[in-house]
């Protein structure tokens, strides 16, 4: 089985998705799991994990219902206010559904990233997730990675998952020190043995707004990032994610998956490919795979 560990689904309402601008018309519609099944299956990928795209409590309920209705969705990474005094009560409700596997907050857009990550209530919230056996997805821009070092080091009781290889600034990749700073900061985080890394979301870190497809130079930079992540994390702490449908701003699902398929087949052994495509996700998210018949 191959698992796509990073997909988003929504019923599009402009007021709920302020990050979807008018320059992104391809995203201004509904997206459901069934909409991605054909390109997934064409790439040999049969299952997904739904990741929050809205910072509101009903997002978790919405995604859990989708998981109940769609067997291909193996798990949900939801959203809740991790600083809330009602966190324990909410988790007791949601964890009755085995599809709930973790949570994410869009830290990258916070006005004070270091302040949030060091906030005592936020720290307690993530610690409570970990005691419940739930993962936490870390979403940051590349220049913010140093801000997460102490936070990730302290939250070591369960898996943390770094989304999008730490979002390297590929649109500025040719500028002095951009790649080297990201590489250094990624390696520092990778020293934490409880941190997984998703090879995901890189096509939209390129200059997609000025191109109809990922350029040869950007494609080479993406492969370089994959190689750097492999060297830093090793094959037992990497997972594939498409970031569909957001990836469609720059590339179709099939192109994103094909890049990962070709990279994995050329860099990883058979057993390491099994880890990359499935086993690592099972460990990080505590997934229960459907029994084969």
Residues of each region from the PLM?
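Divalent metal-dependent hydrolysis catalytic cores, especially in the metallo-beta-lactamase
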Residues: 21-29, 34-55, 73-81, 101-108, ...
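Active-site gating/metal-coordination segments in enzymes
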Residues: 58-143, 150-152, 166, 202, ...
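Mid-to-C-terminal alpha-helical segments outside catalytic/metal-binding sites
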Residues: 1-5, 26-47, 227-228, 233-239, ...
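Catalytic pocket-lining loop regions of alpha/beta-barrel enzymes
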Residues: 116-239
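Conserved, mostly hydrophobic/aromatic
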Residues: 6, 48, 63, 76, ...
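Alpha-helical scaffolding within the catalytic cores
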Residues: 32-36, 58-59, 86-89, 146, ...
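Short, electropositive alpha-helical surface patch
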Residues: 58-74, 155-162, 215-231, 253-265
């Amino acid at each position: 089985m191959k698992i796509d560990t990073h997909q988003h689904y929504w019923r599009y309402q402009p007021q709920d998705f302020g990050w979807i601008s008018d320059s992104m018309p391809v995203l201004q519609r509904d997206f459901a799991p069934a909409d991605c099944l054909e390109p997934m299956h064409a790439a040999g990928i049969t299952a997904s994990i739904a990741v929050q795209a809205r910072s509101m409590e009903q997002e978790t309920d919405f995604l859990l219902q989708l998981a109940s209705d769609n067997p291909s969705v193996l798990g949900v990474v939801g959203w809740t206010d991790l600083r809330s005094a009602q966190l324990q009560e909410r988790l007791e409700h949601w964890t009755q559904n085995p599809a709930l596997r973790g949570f994410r907050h869009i830290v990258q857009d916070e006005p004070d990233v270091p302040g949030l990550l060091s906030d005592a209530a936020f720290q307690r919230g993530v610690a409570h997730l970990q005691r419940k056996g739930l993962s936490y997805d870390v979403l940051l821009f590349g220049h913010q990675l140093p801000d997460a070092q102490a936070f990730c080091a302290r939250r070591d009781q369960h898996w943390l998952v770094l989304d999008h290889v730490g979002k390297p600034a590929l649109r500025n990749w040719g500028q002095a020190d951009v790649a080297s700073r990201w590489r250094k900061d990624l390696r520092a985080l990778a020293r934490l043995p409880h941190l997984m890394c998703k090879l995901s979301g890189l096509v939209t870190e390129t200059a997609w707004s000025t191109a109809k497809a990922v350029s040869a130079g950007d494609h080479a930079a993406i492969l370089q990032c994959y190689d750097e992540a492999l060297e830093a994390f090793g094959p037992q702490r990497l997972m594939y994610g498409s970031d569909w449908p957001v990836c469609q701003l720059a590339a179709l699902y099939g192109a994103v998956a094909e890049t990962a398929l070709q990279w994995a087949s050329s860099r990883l052994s058979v057993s390491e490919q099994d880890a990359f495509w499935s086993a690592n996700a099972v460990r990080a998210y505590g997934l229960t795979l459907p029994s084969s018949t």
